[in-house]
Amino acid sequence: MKLQVPRNGLKRSLFHKKRKELLSSLPKIEARAVAKYIRISPRKARAIANTIRGKSVEEAFQILAFSPKKAARIMEKVLKSAVANAENNFGLSVENLYVSECYVNDGPRMKRIWPRGRGRADIIQKRMSHITVVVRDRSREDEYRKALEELQKKISSEE
């Protein structure tokens, strides 16, 4: 559930000004980690990302440990970083964490020349990936949802 921008009454500019302040009062339930410019094809990395999305952190680590893919090693590092961020920055317990988002975006492509017959050349694209993993605390989601609803009521009452 996201904060709704009021249609009339409270001005949009005032809403956006207060938005950051209001959102900081909500309990922290998620942490993220991003690995950029990783030298692996996004298509290959997405296959691994799809297997761990929605799983508990322990289950995701087990899946990654037994996967023979190169992307699994990279994903494991990013997941470990997200869990460490959750513990250190927000004090979330590892037992309640699950992988809420895990996605792979395209990074830049390095273009290389591949010599072919008769003096021709083909261009080879070496692809890169940006990998993002977001972990959430299941036990605090209800608390977060209630706080968000209260905040929404507060904003709508100011209209």
Swiss-Prot record:
GO term, biological process aspect, one: translation
Superkingdom of the source species: Bacteria
Keyword rRNA-binding in annotation: yes
Keyword annotations: Ribonucleoprotein, Ribosomal protein, RNA-binding, rRNA-binding
Molecular function GO terms recorded: rRNA binding; structural constituent of ribosome
CDD domains the UniProt entry points to: Ribosomal_L22
GO CC field: cytosolic large ribosomal subunit
Disulfide bonds: none
PANTHER family (alphabetical): CHLOROPLAST 50S RIBOSOMAL PROTEIN L22-RELATED (PTHR13501), LARGE RIBOSOMAL SUBUNIT PROTEIN UL22M (PTHR13501:SF8)
Family classification: Belongs to the universal ribosomal protein uL22 family.
Quaternary context: Part of the 50S ribosomal subunit.
Cross-referenced NCBIfam families: rplV_bact
Job of this protein: This protein binds specifically to 23S rRNA; its binding is stimulated by other ribosomal proteins, e.g. L4, L17, and L20. It is important during the early stages of 50S assembly. It makes multiple contacts with different domains of the 23S rRNA in the assembled 50S subunit and ribosome.
Entry-linked HAMAP family: Ribosomal_uL22_B
Listed name of the protein: Large ribosomal subunit protein uL22
Source species: Thermotoga maritima (strain ATCC 43589 / DSM 3109 / JCM 10099 / NBRC 100826 / MSB8)
Record lineage: Bacteria, Thermotogati, Thermotogota, Thermotogae, Thermotogales
Gene that this sequence comes from: rplV
